[in-house]
Amino acid sequence: MRHQKSGRKFNRTDAHRGAMFSNMIASLFKYQLIKTTLPKAKELRRFAEPLITLAKVDSVANRRLAFARLRNKEAVGILFSNLGPRYITRPGGYIRLLKCGFRHGDNAPMAYVEMLERPIIAEEVT
């Protein structure tokens, strides 16, 4: 029986699941907004928010802990230089999930995963 077992498996091995979420977190930190399925978005929040909390205190030990999870130097740099200082006063809840309909093909529920307080870049209209 699977009582008290938290986390979704997504029909993947443990290594595949870990690599998938590491890549998704790196993309989220780089682009500030990604689109994925709703169950993956909900699970992604469980992995990403503790990393942002870790980045509030910039130390070598915290950078190594973040790198152990992400395995991406660029994402760790963004995490500690941009995101940690941005959320220094926020006690949690750094990520917003926005439902955005269903995927054509398999009708899977989709969602946007967005970093709160992200800078909005105005596009020039010509």
UniProtKB/Swiss-Prot annotation:
Organism source for this protein? Xylella fastidiosa (strain Temecula1 / ATCC 700964)
HAMAP family tied to this protein: Ribosomal_bL17
Q: How does it assemble?
A: Part of the 50S ribosomal subunit. Contacts protein L32.
Listed name of the protein: Large ribosomal subunit protein bL17
- Gene3D superfamilies referenced in this protein's UniProt entry, alphabetically: Ribosomal protein L17
Please give the biological process terms from Gene Ontology that the record holds.
translation
Its family?
Answer: Belongs to the bacterial ribosomal protein bL17 family.
Entry-linked InterPro entries: Ribosomal_bL17, Ribosomal_bL17_CS, Ribosomal_bL17_sf
Lineage: superkingdom? Bacteria
List each coiled-coil range. none
